[in-house]
Amino acid sequence: MAAHGGSAASSALKGLIQQFTTITGASESVGKHMLEACNNNLEMAVTMFLDGGGIAEEPSTSSASVSTVRPHTEEEVRAPIPQKQEILVEPEPLFGAPKRRRPARSIFDGFRDFQTETIRQEQELRNGGAIDKKLTTLADLFRPPIDLMHKGSFETAKECGQMQNKWLMINIQNVQDFACQCLNRDVWSNEAVKNIIREHFIFWQVYHDSEEGQRYIQFYKLGDFPYVSILDPRTGQKLVEWHQLDVSSFLDQVTGFLGEHGQLDGLSSSPPKKCARSESLIDASEDSQLEAAIRASLQETHFDSTQTKQDSRSDEESESELFSGSEEFISVCGSDEEEEVENLAKSRKSPHKDLGHRKEENRRPLTEPPVRTDPGTATNHQGLPAVDSEILEMPPEKADGVVEGIDVNGPKAQLMLRYPDGKREQITLPEQAKLLALVKHVQSKGYPNERFELLTNFPRRKLSHLDYDITLQEAGLCPQETVFVQERN
């Protein structure tokens, strides 16, 4: 049985040697040697023989010679490795095995096959711009959307979005997450998606382990993949963020975004606007305090410069000027002060001015006092310019009713009233006047005490909670204060 098995193996070996010699034209001894080196694998022996140039040394009959040749033949077994390398550098990679890709050295070329792209560009030039849409390799299936991507940094992408008036769409890719690869394969390759991105967005794709990707992840606190977001290129504000997307959901989400925010053209497509915030009396108190302080300072300076002239006036003129503030100079100043009063009025322009009937109504008591004046004084009085209607004075006839029994020549309290409609009014009352006088004055302006309350901001106090019989001085409203009129809660 052993002899029969040995003869069968010998005949099989002879058959292989005969086939080897027939294919290669080598001698039987060379064929036997190559088959022994390749463990009787005819295909490998023929390949190794041809790779070696078709030349093989005759094996020696001595055992020592065989032992020296065998290590050499063992090295020859490694010959197929260059064959694999040869496929990797095949000049036509579309017909070879996929290439082992080099590490990404750029923020956008992690999956790019530059050689394939060069061939594609040459084909496009030869075909007059036509693109071969047949995907022949796995690399083509998962290739990034090179034609859509902005090839630059995050900052250059924002600048490009500002110049082209387009939103900035960010795609962070994680090569370890297959869902991210599916975005390249399914979503970014869709023609409808490409069209809407080209029209409205600057598309910036970056890999999570790149320098730019790490910086973006650290700043915008990214946690889940796949990741797609839309930013305002002018401010860098993240407007929306999506994770699980297919073609239909992407188109729905983007359509909804554009319907809400529009195009970035500065008109209907302006970025998400800040909520229009109604002007609050308390929020504006700091500005009003500053204005009141400046106005009071100007009035005090002006009062000192004209006190000498006022002393020479008649008693009747003095009585008509007891409650005058910033406008007392309108009724008594000559032409020397007209320019200064006019400049002061022009410098206090406000967006809330009411130049209608109320302006004339509030100015009337000041322009028609029952006083005796000489012709020169009357001329000056009638020729004075109009003053800001928002800085008003309590008319003397009204003041007489609320300050009976009080020394009207004593110290005054200058109050700036801020109404809910944005209008301002400055009044002057004696320090010993009751708080009730102020409440009645506000009621006369159409703000009843049942619905509206008075308060100050620094310190914050609700005057409506105080005793109305206390004086303005006791209420802490002297020498000047800003009082806000607001609706009760």
Curated annotation (Swiss-Prot):
Gene Ontology biological process terms, A to Z: proteasome-mediated ubiquitin-dependent protein catabolic process
Comment text on domains: The UIM (ubiquitin-interacting motif) is required to engage the NEDD8 modification on cullins. The UBX domain mediates interaction with VCP/p97.
GO cellular component: cytosol; nucleoplasm; nucleus; VCP-NPL4-UFD1 AAA ATPase complex
Compositional bias per record (Basic and acidic residues), positions renumbered to this chain: 352-366
Start and end residues of each UBX domain: 408-485
Covalent cross-link Glycyl lysine isopeptide (Lys-Gly) (interchain with G-Cter in ubiquitin) as placed by the record, residue numbers: K99
Cited Pfam families: Thioredoxin_7 (PF13899), UBA_8 (PF22566), UBX (PF00789)
Modified-residue entries (Phosphothreonine), positions: T306
Domain UBA: from-to ranges: 2-54
Complex formation: Interacts with neddylated CUL2, ubiquitinated HIF1A, and VCP/p97.
GO molecular function, one term: RNA polymerase II-specific DNA-binding transcription factor binding
Name of the gene encoding the protein in the UniProt record: UBXN7
Modification sites for Phosphoserine: S278, S280, S285, S288
Positions of the UIM domain: 285-304
Keyword Nucleotide-binding: no
Cross-link Glycyl lysine isopeptide (Lys-Gly) (interchain with G-Cter in SUMO2): where in chain: K84, K134
Protein name: UBX domain-containing protein 7
Residues found modified as N-acetylalanine: A2
Localization (cell): Nucleus
Function comment: Ubiquitin-binding adapter that links a subset of NEDD8-associated cullin ring ligases (CRLs) to the segregase VCP/p97, to regulate turnover of their ubiquitination substrates.
Regions annotated as coiled coil: none
